[in-house]
From Swiss-Prot:
Protein name: Lysine--tRNA ligase
Catalyzed chemical reaction(s): tRNA(Lys) + L-lysine + ATP = L-lysyl-tRNA(Lys) + AMP + diphosphate
Key words of the record: Aminoacyl-tRNA synthetase, ATP-binding, Cytoplasm, Ligase, Magnesium, Metal-binding, Nucleotide-binding, Protein biosynthesis
Cofactor descriptive note: Binds 3 Mg(2+) ions per subunit.
Species annotation: Salmonella typhi
Family: Belongs to the class-II aminoacyl-tRNA synthetase family.
NCBIfam families registered for this protein in UniProt: lysS_bact (TIGR00499), PRK00484.1 (NF001756), PRK12445.1 (NF009101)
Amino acid sequence: MSEQNAQGADEVVDLNNEMKARREKLAALREQGIPFPNDFRRDRTSDQLHAEFDAKEAEELEALNIEVSVAGRMMTRRIMGKASFVTLQDVGGRIQLYVARDDLPEGVYNEQFKKWDLGDILGAKGKLFKTKTGELSIHCTELRLLTKALRPLPDKFHGLQDQEARYRQRYLDLISNDESRNTFKTRSKILAGIRQFMVARGFMEVETPMMQVIPGGASARPFITHHNALDLDMYLRIAPELYLKRLVVGGFERVFEINRNFRNEGISVRHNPEFTMMELYMAYADYKDLIELTESLFRTLAQDVLGTTQVPYGDEVFDFGKPFEKLTMHEAIKKYRPETDMADLDNFDSAKAIAESIGIHVEKSWGLGRIVTEIFDEVAEAHLIQPTFITEYPAEVSPLARRNDVNPEITDRFEFFIGGREIGNGFSELNDAEDQAQRFLDQVNAKAAGDDEAMFYDEDYVTALEHGLPPTAGLGIGIDRMVMLFTNSHTIRDVILFPAMRPVK
């Protein structure tokens, strides 16, 4: 047996012995009557205590004579004869307990407290005071075991063994990793901030179907499921777009939805098959209005959630305080591939030659617009570090966007990039029912030619457009990628509580 395998075997034995001892303690608790009591109530969390009392001097705390009740997980314990110090962790952080034998009911200290284990969940009551080192603490007069932990804390056995364990057992990651807890607290604040921002601007939050007969609103491969009662194959939605625009037809002029989308595609540091999007639609507006809204949203969130418009990310600092850069797709290609002749981007053969010269395999079904978009993706996208809007997307890759009035080969569309990745996509909506029907037919032909991500023909949506969609602009923002930026996270798995994982065999 190798040294590594021997060490692993020893750890398994240690863990089994530890769990055996803990189960024996639980059995003793069961014999006493109520092993998992639910009658303890706390009146403060640790962060509330620190916010209110950290600044007070020891003498002032003593004079105030404040009694508090707290509850949480025992993370550390230092037993020093007749007294001990405990670190208790709750949702707000950590607070220190001072536990003295003579201040508790008879027998609690030696017969109960000393037999409890790290990871157990406790309830404590006592007076606030400060130690000689100035640490806010609770001098306990009551201490109760609320939940017996049968497994030890991860750091007792060298922490979580690998990165994947953090995702598979997120509960352990949250117990032991302050950074992870803060990431998901920030995510919650971002979502609350988005809702506040949208409602303040007259938008109504709505919910649209997660299972759809026709998957639409994006170019992606869907998940397929079966509805037994209807005996009908259905699709998990890839986007809510077409349903939201039906609502605008119906008279709800400003709507938004924050919810899950599902795309049966690859998993990477930027992609999870199940992800969260915010989509909004705004009648009597165009894509330029949404550029302004997007810039304001990100600037507001940075200031409100992080307290600054200078957001660090790896070696970069994203500046949400200054005006965001705006480039057309052709301008971006020229900027990051200076030798490009702009005229070549308007000619199929010339653009194809450029694409092939930089290693892009051009499919037979691609038109000029798709080729130029692929060139942009290859030469420019990774360089768009600071907040940047890219405009004038080809109509070929924008089947739901309104054509530009001056040049019908492009659309009134933008994508929003930060850190070299797309964060948002918005455009003036196509509200010409006949044009939309033709573009759906083009997508059907592309699917027949082998494009799995091409859209289906949605006859009911065309019918809705025939009733009249007001001039409208729509925007989609990837919430997970937004959270990555605001929390300095470099993989999408770090900002999704339970990311998609292959089952452990």
